[in-house]
Amino acid sequence: MLAQLPPALQSLHLPLRLKLWDGNQFDLGPSPQVTILVKEPQLIGQLTHPSMEQLGTAFVEGKLELEGDIGEAIRVCDELSEALFTDEDEQPPERRSHDKRTDAEAISYHYDVSNAFYQLWLDQDMAYSCAYFREPDNTLDQAQQDKFDHLCRKLRLNAGDYLLDVGCGWGGLARFAAREYDAKVFGITLSKEQLKLGRQRVKAEGLTDKVDLQILDYRDLPQDGRFDKVVSVGMFEHVGHANLALYCQKLFGAVREGGLVMNHGITAKHVDGRPVGRGAGEFIDRYVFPHGELPHLSMISASICEAGLEVVDVESLRLHYAKTLHHWSENLENQLHKAAALVPEKTLRIWRLYLAGCAYAFEKGWINLHQILAVKPYADGHHDLPWTREDMYR
């Protein structure tokens, strides 16, 4: 039976079962843990030279089904791709143009899916960014609260500080900073769905005198240095390589002298920012984050410094994000019946692959998560930061 498959597939030894449209099935190794159901004959040819993008696209379009644990399916599919995919198939990075209209459309595409859909698998505060696990067995809710606190501690946030939250999402960090640190917060987003629910939660907690959430593009931020601290969490991935300098200049102009800026976001493995993961990056660009671009740590750090800010602290949270994504993926998999009632089948397929696939990508080191803390020095070059980092952990 195995002889009916193309030679490239016959020679593989993977814990994978191929089940064909005609009922035939083939085990590519002992004790298969994952089954790929190929529903169309022409897909067999693609499987002899597959990329993660091709496999993902076939699943999203319903031409291929995955049976078994979704995380294990991602791993086995990557092993299949690794065995048959060549370096020549990799494409050079494509630089994207970004303007207010296209960025707003991209944000709406990703974040305006359904508040109820996000609530199924996010934590209670709906923090859609990397959590911070002080202990590996902490719950997602606890880890997200600890992330908020970790950011506020790094920013040395004090009572009465005016904090700018760029890409505030549903306002979880803004409300935490106001509630726990007595800060005044101005949060901006481009998502109308996020803004609506975020404002409802601000009102429900009685924080309307401290938290102001608005629709505003970062390019339109006031440049009079009115903010004591600036935080940007999971937002700069949407900025694009071409606009990194402008983005950092806007943060510089928004914060006062002596103030602090925190940039928390996903970074690329390669210095030139090219996609990794044998087509995984292309899948995300096509279906999940249109126009998204991940810069390397060196690229965003250089842009921060060129804008006039001084980088004073950098921390990698790569494995924290892998664990966060595992929580999200598991939560979604446990709520598939509810999710199917909230979003179209194609959307649900995209998100199942995206969450499990990103968890795998962070584990493999294809992408990273860095928190970069910077200060805007006074005119004479000094600043007020402590001589050590010890205060952040007291």
From Swiss-Prot:
One Pfam family recorded for the sequence: CMAS
Protein's organism: Pseudomonas putida (Arthrobacter siderocapsulatus)
GO molecular function, one term: methyltransferase activity
EC number: 2.1.1.-
InterPro entries noted in UniProt: CFA/CMAS, CfaB-like, CMAS, DUF7884, SAM-dependent_MTases_sf
Protein origin, superkingdom: Bacteria
Similarity-based family: Belongs to the CFA/CMAS family.
Keywords: Lipid biosynthesis, Lipid metabolism, Methyltransferase, S-adenosyl-L-methionine, Transferase
One GO BP annotation of this record: methylation
Enzyme type, top EC level: transferase
Stated name of the protein: Probable fatty acid methyltransferase
Residues annotated as the enzyme's active site: 358
Keyword S-adenosyl-L-methionine: yes
Residues given in the record as S-adenosyl-L-methionine binding sites: 128-129, 163-171, 189-194
